Amino acid sequence: MVRWKKPKRFLCRKTQDYERIDDIENNDEDSDDDVILEINHDGEHEDNYRNPMIRMAYIPIVIIAVIYSSFIFFFALFIEASAHTNSKCSEAHEKEKMSSGLLTPPMKHILEDRTKYKNEIKLLKTFNVHLTYSTWINSILEILALIYSFLLLLVDRQYLYPLSQVILYLFTRINFVYTDIYGRFFSPSDVVGAITTEVIYDLIRWQSESKLFKVFPFTPCPLPLLLFPIFLSILQVFANQKHTHVYETVLLIFFRIMTRFAGRRPFILSYQVLRSGIASFQSATSHDIAKTLNKVTHCCLNVFASSAFFVLLMVLVDKQGLDKTPKCLAALYAFAMWMQLATVRYRHFIPLILTVVIELVITGLVSYQTGEFIFSHTAEVKDYVFTVMFTIIAVFRFVFIIILFKVLIYKNPPHSLTTTVLLKPTNIPVTFSSIKAPQELDPTNPYYPQTVYNSNQSKNNLLPLTRD
């Protein structure tokens, strides 16, 4: 029987969690045992040094090393090498546990079960159609209201209502481009406010003694001309309410269906960790949670490095920056970056505590020296720019320290009943007391309901059996 030789590309083909590895030197052996499955750790056991995001954090470190001192970069490399060695040791330890039967490989959802959310997906398609219709309705209502206002301006009599209508529509449009959550439509309160303002203008017009309108000659707007824009505004209120309701329902269904968080942006994930911790990732698998938290830690590290580099750049750009900051600022930021790197690599609280101490020292020294400089000189507006920017960056860094702390809480959960490994019971039971065991005890039954198992003091604590 002729067997075709497998190409090298097939032998080293890589799938999602497993990699086919074949001994190329033994291609001539006709055996299926040559192809093995080797686990590529990901998520919690991910080798973070391979992640391209981590390389961005070294750019400020290299620049600071070139400007100030080269030992900064070498110490960072030392942390990387030690973390890599520690990762290899933990990987070997887990393989040893797995070979002994004490650890099983984690399960992962490779394909999403679309049949589970069949009704939700159908409902989402329906809601998308409703959102499209409500978008067109809101747009048509806005265009009609504006066209009506400009048509009234073309009449010989310049009414106060059309002019105020145009001004209010333009003002609310500019305002809601920047302030509205959806950025597309008016809210009901603004429409009602616009109507109220227009009615007040018309009511003020009937007071001929008003000093405010003596300078501006105008004629009152007839009531029939006011009915159509009020009717449009009421329709717009209902259309906007319908659109908002459908939009919020779509968001709820979308967050219910979505179980993968790895594709989100790091800053959005960091905000979710800061706001609700790991509770926002309850619908995801443990594999996706681990990948998400790794992305958050990388984002924190990049923020720390880039913010430190930005502060040092402000010191160099400012002519009096060296007088406002201590001379050891670069060394302190370098030491803080080492501790942050060690926190992400070792996933331990001690480097994070040292990071907080260093940040407090930096903030205190810069605040003291900047205040001393401002009080000793004639302060101008530009002298406060560095202080304001440094305060904003310091608060920003402390926020990401809190995010990193929440990630470490999940990475290193406290010892509890759910995280404690219970050993197998022995064949020798130990009772609490004979009162709680009124029935006859059977010492040969290891699963007696009123027994606990202790292999160390089993013989000493065994109660004697008495028979009537």
UniProtKB/Swiss-Prot annotation:
One of its GO terms (cellular component) is membrane. Keywords: Membrane, Transmembrane, Transmembrane helix. Its main location: membrane. This is Uncharacterized protein T28D9.4. The keyword Transmembrane applies. The chain crosses the membrane at residues 59-79, 135-155, 215-235, 297-317, 348-368, 385-405. It is found in: Membrane. It is a multi-pass membrane protein. It comes from the Eukaryota.
